[in-house]
Each structure stands twice: as C-alpha cells, then as structure tokens.
Swiss-Prot record:
Pfam families: Frataxin_Cyay (PF01491). PANTHER family: FRATAXIN (PTHR16821), FRATAXIN, MITOCHONDRIAL (PTHR16821:SF2). This is Iron-sulfur cluster assembly protein CyaY. Involved in iron-sulfur (Fe-S) cluster assembly. May act as a regulator of Fe-S biogenesis. PROSITE patterns: FRATAXIN_1, FRATAXIN_2. The keyword Metal-binding applies. One of its GO terms (molecular function) is ferrous iron binding. GO terms for biological process: iron-sulfur cluster assembly.
Length: 106
C-alpha cells in the first residue's frame, strides 16, 4: 500500500465513523471531533476514544479505556496486529462500555 492509498482508506474510515454517529439515536451524547489525523470521540462521562493514523506504518491506532490497538489493512478491513480482531468490533465494544449503552457503527 502506498501513502495515498492509506490516506484514502483512513479518510473513508473517519467519514464512516462520523456518519454513523450523526445517524445514531441513542440516549448518550457522543461528540466526534477530527483534528488533523486524529479523531476523538468524547462521552458524557468524560472518557474518550482516540483514533489516529500512523502514516509511516500505514496503520490506524485505537486508544480506549480498555487499552491500545494497532490495525493493519488486510483483506478489505482493518485488523488488529496482535489479536486479529476487527476494528469495528473493538470500536463498538469500547464505545458501548464508555457510553453505557449499545453503540453500533454498522
């Protein structure tokens, strides 16, 4: 993967997260802010989820209260380089725990 392909994929990921949160009708207030290559989800309880790009590695990193995860793009999806879990699964689990109600990005 080259840098422009990585940026296209990461931009698509950011856009999908933002669109899904805009369409989400849960009781919790989840704010989404994008600043440069960093996307921050802020929850009512003050906790945050940080998603950022690691361009030199062509990875997306996810930081949650439960821990940090690094994702490589494989077979058309972002996969954790340690556990093999999918990005969307880990993001939904973390967002659900931090929001105190079920959150879906799919």
């Amino acid at each position: 993967m080259n840098d422009s392909e990585f940026h296209r994929l990461a931009d698509g990921l950011w856009m999908t997260i933002e669109e899904r949160l805009d369409a989400w009708d849960g009781d919790s207030d989840i704010d989404c802010e994008i600043n440069g290559g960093v996307l921050t989800l802020s929850f009512e309880n003050g906790s945050k989820i940080i998603i950022n790009r690691q361009e030199p590695l062509h990875q997306v990193w996810l930081a949650t209260k439960q821990g940090g995860y690094h994702f490589d793009y494989k077979n058309d999806e972002w996969i954790c380089d340690r556990s093999g879990e999918r990005f969307w699964d880990l993001l939904e689990t973390a967002a659900t725990q931090q929001a105190g109600e079920a959150v879906s990005f799919r």
